From Swiss-Prot:
It comes from the Bacteria. The keyword Cell membrane does not apply. Binds 1 lipoyl cofactor covalently. The modification N6-lipoyllysine is found at residue 65. The glycine cleavage system catalyzes the degradation of glycine. The H protein shuttles the methylamine group of glycine from the P protein to the T protein. Disulfide bonds: none annotated. Its cofactor is (R)-lipoate. The lineage of its organism: Bacteria, Bacillati, Cyanobacteriota, Cyanophyceae, Oscillatoriophycideae. This is Glycine cleavage system H protein. InterPro entries: 2-oxoA_DH_lipoyl-BS (IPR003016), Biotin_lipoyl (IPR000089), GCV_H (IPR002930), GCV_H/Fam206 (IPR033753), GCV_H_sub (IPR017453), Single_hybrid_motif (IPR011053). Keywords: Lipoyl. It comes from Rippkaea orientalis (strain PCC 8801 / RF-1).
């Protein structure tokens, strides 16, 4: 299966992505991570209004294979969470970069937040290196 990595996103080593629209960051999980997890059975996300700190776990995802913590690529305040994905986490694989987003965050310090994220091509190169 050919996985997509949209160029308008930034990625973390831990496979979360971020799409910025002004000071609003949409955060989700890459198609690679979703494929590796397999059948997703549970998704735990923060409440609206919760403050997130970059690098600190904000939730968890559980599949029949594994359970993994989720990490925000940016710090800020949760302004929305995807209730549909919480109720139907198995649908994350259908559209991870569209309807399968996880949370939306108002970024607290936009200038410094994306320094350690990867472009789509850098992320793909890292994944291909992991196969060796």
């Amino acid at each position: 299966m050919d996985l997509e990595y949209p160029d308008d996103l930034r990625y973390l080593d831990s496979h979360e992505y971020v799409r910025l629209d002004g000071e609003i960051a949409t955060i989700g999980l890459s198609a690679f991570a979703i494929e590796q997890l397999g059948d997703i059975v549970h998704l735990e996300l923060p409440e609206v209004g919760e403050a997130l700190e970059k690098g600190e776990s904000f939730g968890a995802i559980e599949s029949v294979k594994a359970a993994e913590d989720l990490y925000p690529p940016v710090s800020g305040t949760v302004i929305d969470r995807n209730e549909e994905m919480i109720e139907n986490p198995d649908q994350l694989a259908d559209d991870p970069y569209g309807d399968g987003w996880l949370i939306k965050v108002r970024v607290s310090n936009l200038d410094a937040e994306l320094d350690d994220t990867l472009s789509a091509s850098e992320y793909q190169a890292q994944l291909e290196g992991d196969d060796d």
